[in-house]
Amino acid sequence: MEIFHQAIWLIPVLPLSASMLSGIGLLTFRETTSDLRRLHGALAIGAMALSFVVSLGVLWNQLHGIAPVRWIIEWMLTDTFRLEIGYWVDPLTSTMLVVVTSVALLVMIYSDEYMHVDEGYVRFFVYLSIFTTSMLGLVLSPNLVQVYGFWELVGMCSYLLVGFWFTRPTAAEASQKAFITNRVGDFGLLLGILALYWMTGSFEFASIADRLGDLLIAIPSLRTIACIACILVFMGPIAKSAQFPLHVWLPDAMEGPTPISALIHAATMVAAGVFLVARMFPVFDQLPLVMELIAWTGTLTAFLGATMALTQSDIKKGLAYSTMSQLGYMIMALGTGAYSEALFHLTTHAYSKALLFLAAGSVIHGMEPVVGFSPMQNQNMHRMGGLRKYMPLTAMTFLLGTCSICGIPPLACFWSKDAILAEVFATHPTCWLIAWLTAGMTGFYMFRIYFLTFEGSFRSDLGRAKPKESHLGMVAPLIILAIPTVAIGSLGTPFAPVWETFVHAPGQLSSLDEEFDLAEFLEMAGSSVGIGLLGISLSSLMYRNYAIDATRISEYFSPLNRLFASKWYIDDLYAQVIVQGTRTIAQTLLIFDQRIIDGAVNLTAFGTLSAADTLKYWENGRVQFYILSIIFGVLFGSWLLTTHLSSL
């Protein structure tokens, strides 16, 4: 199996090659390429399938004890500076490679049917392949410089894909919002990388951690600077993983095609932030203040995301806020030292959320013939209802994903979320309490989405065509994703913790030697499942059995309802303070430029013209006038000279 480690470089190169071939064809032979559109889709799918096979081989080797692989070449070398590029494969890398390639492959298979009538079909697959290549390159990066390069490529691709339907004003605005919001975090990340290099003289992850540890022992006063540098680095994941307060771009990103929403929310863009925090964990772990900040950022994000999801009527935005909340769990876990548990939840959530988004795309696809192609209609859950009768496979797979996200045993996310809550309870009880309440809200809003969409009666019966089950090309990926949604959690059970033995923080040993406490497990699992079931029960009473009037409840809690529906007014605050403030400053500077700067220049020009206009009368062509002027000039000069001499 050594051949797979020798072929690691093919994992990002294969999808990159497919995107380049299709992209060049689209630029040079547009009509021919469009005529062969399905062939280009097959090329992208085939390249991703090969990358997935190689990734599986790499993971197999890592599982069987092959040492981590580090291959680098010196790209820039001077007497005082050395920059290397290459790849680094360890258990974290090999796991992420499989997650990214498997989800991307299924998204591409799904997209082949979902996008087949779209005129931008080939362009979509070009962007999709570059997007996946960027994430694979980021995962393989051995140092912060290479990470930053691929980090920016991921951001660029998200801009292209969120704004894929750029003729829609909402899509164009959403892509700009995502791009600009992420630039804020990326600027902090760049400053943090440079600060860490200034302190340690290295961009390598392991070297930074070791050298920083030595520096903090030798020069304790550097701790403040180190904290600032690490917080700046953390700004990148805050934006990329949609953490408070830079989370505002994520719901708007739903303006892109649904397959892209699945990929962004499952295995690429938002996962990049969690991955970077995990890579930098040995550095952050030396600074308790930074770890506390990370833990509380994740906790607040999990809570805020859940509250915002409670009132959503758009199925994709409801799932988007769910992603924001679950990412908060992962960041909280990393901040509290639960490294293995956070990455386990990243993996289980990736498959469950990809399943949910692709199932939502199937619903939207089925609603389009009934209510039209406007997202305001075909994504509105209040226009749905009773779809389980028309789309049984979609409903079944969506229900599996919903139960998994809610933490219902024995589905995948139960094991990872329960492990996070158990670890957080031991070190940060307040964070645990907030996360525990969030688990209850998760059960409520996730089943609210399911009940509004699939249960009850169909609420858009306009005498037109009924929704139909999607084509096999879209349903098959849902069925395949249902398998890891059910089964992958078995890797991280406390009875046989395969995951923890394989993925743990660098320099730390797994906790296999700790004796399993069944009573403690049942207590923690019972509390998390219990609060989740309470949320599900309330949701059922309100949106399935209608025993509780949801409208009256929202009216009774009107202030809270408005607060959650308005997304805690955070977007409004940014719009008024930052956007409108920037515009006001720009308009003020424009007025200053036009009236002061331009006015001064124009006044000088006017004065010159006036002087010239006055002097032109002295050039009248009459000799006697010139003689008279000379006489007056001589007399005036003589008077000045006489006056000056008499004063001496």
UniProtKB/Swiss-Prot annotation:
Lineage: Eukaryota, Viridiplantae, Chlorophyta, Nephroselmidophyceae, Nephroselmidales
UniProt entry keywords in alphabetical sequence: Chloroplast, Membrane, NAD, NADP, Plastid, Plastoquinone, Quinone, Thylakoid, Translocase, Transmembrane, Transmembrane helix, Transport
One MF annotation (Gene Ontology) recorded for this entry: quinone binding
Subcellular location: Plastid, Chloroplast thylakoid membrane
Family: Belongs to the complex I subunit 5 family.
Function: NDH shuttles electrons from NAD(P)H:plastoquinone, via FMN and iron-sulfur (Fe-S) centers, to quinones in the photosynthetic chain and possibly in a chloroplast respiratory chain. The immediate electron acceptor for the enzyme in this species is believed to be plastoquinone. Couples the redox reaction to proton translocation, and thus conserves the redox energy in a proton gradient.
PANTHER family: NADH-UBIQUINONE OXIDOREDUCTASE CHAIN 5
The reaction(s) this protein catalyses: a plastoquinone + NADH + (n+1) H(+)(in) = a plastoquinol + NAD(+) + n H(+)(out); a plastoquinone + NADPH + (n+1) H(+)(in) = a plastoquinol + NADP(+) + n H(+)(out)
EC class of the enzyme, as a word: translocase
Quaternary structure and partners: NDH is composed of at least 16 different subunits, 5 of which are encoded in the nucleus.
Record InterPro entries: NADH_UbQ_OxRdtase_chlpt_su5_C (IPR002128), NADHpl_OxRdtase_5_subgr (IPR018393), ND/Mrp_TM (IPR001750), NU5C-like (IPR003945), Proton_antipo_N (IPR001516)
Entry's EC annotation: 7.1.1.-
Top-level taxon of origin: Eukaryota
Name recorded for this polypeptide: NAD(P)H-quinone oxidoreductase subunit 5, chloroplastic
Biological processes, Gene Ontology terms: ATP synthesis coupled electron transport; electron transport coupled proton transport
